[in-house]
Amino acid sequence: EIGSGLVGSEMCIRDRYIPAMRKSELQLAFKVQRGKKTYDLPRVTVAEGVISTAEIANAQELNPAITPDKFQRIIEEKYSADIMFLIQQANLRSEQLKSEQMNALHNEIKAATEAPNKELTNINVASYASPDGGVKLNTTLAENREKNTVNYMKKSLKKGKIDADMTAEFTAQDWEGFKELVSKSNIQDKELILNVLSMYSDPEQREREIKNMSSVFKVLAEEILPQLRYSRITASVNVIGKSDEEISKLAKEDAKALSVDELLYAATLVKTNKEKAAIYAKVVEIYPNDYRGYNNLGMVQYEEGDLAAAQNNFAKAARIAPNTPEVAMNQGLISLANNDYAKAEQAFGKSAGVEELNEALGVFYMKKGDYNAAVKAFGDVKSNNAALAQILTKDYSKAKATLAGVEAPNANTYYLMAVLGARTNNEQMVVSNLKKSISMDSSKAQQAATDLEFAKFDIASLVK
């Protein structure tokens, strides 16, 4: 028996649903009091059993969130050096070509061509003229600086027997560079100079206005403008990491030879959860201070139904990285699976931006009985839980399409399809899908035998 009472004019059942209620009777008992005597009248059965379709909502079918690796097979590195020019000159000075910057650049270019895991992809020359001197003069000047720098680099590469693609461009008046340098300077009237730049877009007008500011132009000529007369040479180098085959082999034979990101990446190359768990266990062993190993090991354990082990590893991840949304969401899944909705809600509130969050919220809302909110949270997700929310809001056509789109149908998928058949009075749909469901999970026979969704259909032969 369960407790009940009146709230206003409505009956309130005080006990929560338990599976035994599927096969039960709801009876009304009456007591009549006349004077000092009380009479018990015969009980009246008003309903049999409980339709518990909402209880099919399954937190363990949700996808926990992975904390991804940052592995990049190809990493682009850039090395630069500047060649400075004197005012209104484009010739390359010897001291500039022998500077520490240039020597370092040549060494990096040479190293890139000799290293087996590096590739020199491009050398770019960008030449500039300062904004004083007029557009026509500076165009010729910047163009000549580009030409001379390119010729120098071509000769240098040829001498070193280095083959590389080369690109080049020039900027006649480097107003952007001028603005940046002035902004970072300690020049007394720099705000006045910046205002001129914002007020006038014509380069000739800008130059005239700034030259009229005699109090600051001398400082500009000495401190700012010389820095804008240069060619910048940039070498782009690809550093090529280990192949998938190399990473997979090392993950099995010598995991310590891999970085944490390479080892995390190795787990994405295997197919089974057993293989993934073995790799994540190595991450935890070799890199115990990286929360991702614990989280991802817990993720695999959750998918395998080992909630206690998953909870333990999620907790370890949270201790190392307490503000990580993915870890918080996974802890929310544990709370949801344990019917601790207050903790689940708190955890999901810390999980903004996690891709898997909306589906988790969908199940949370279903567990709370807010089916419309669940449908909204699921959006266009194709899952059993999403279809269940649509069934509970009586959107049967959409639920059917959702179930048809489930990537890996399981016993629950076909059971829900049978429920849809019952809701739409399609006996063939009920029978065929129950057969499939029971063939995948024999416990579905017992579930169907007491499910009032199928009360009007002859399924006795299926559930023996």
Report the location of each language-model feature.
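Single conserved hydrophobic/aromatic residue that forms the stacking wall/gate
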Residues: 2-8, 13
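Periplasmic peptidoglycan-binding/anchoring modules of Gram-negative envelope and division proteins
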Residues: 65-67, 85, 90-126, 154, ...
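Periplasmic OmpA-like peptidoglycan-binding domain that tethers envelope proteins to the cell wall
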Residues: 130-234
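Residue-level recognition of tetratricopeptide repeat
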Residues: 268, 299, 333, 363, ...
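Register position in tetratricopeptide repeats
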Residues: 303-304, 337-338, 367, 392-393, ...
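Terminal, low-structured helical/coil segments at or just beyond the last alpha-helical repeat
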Residues: 435, 439-464
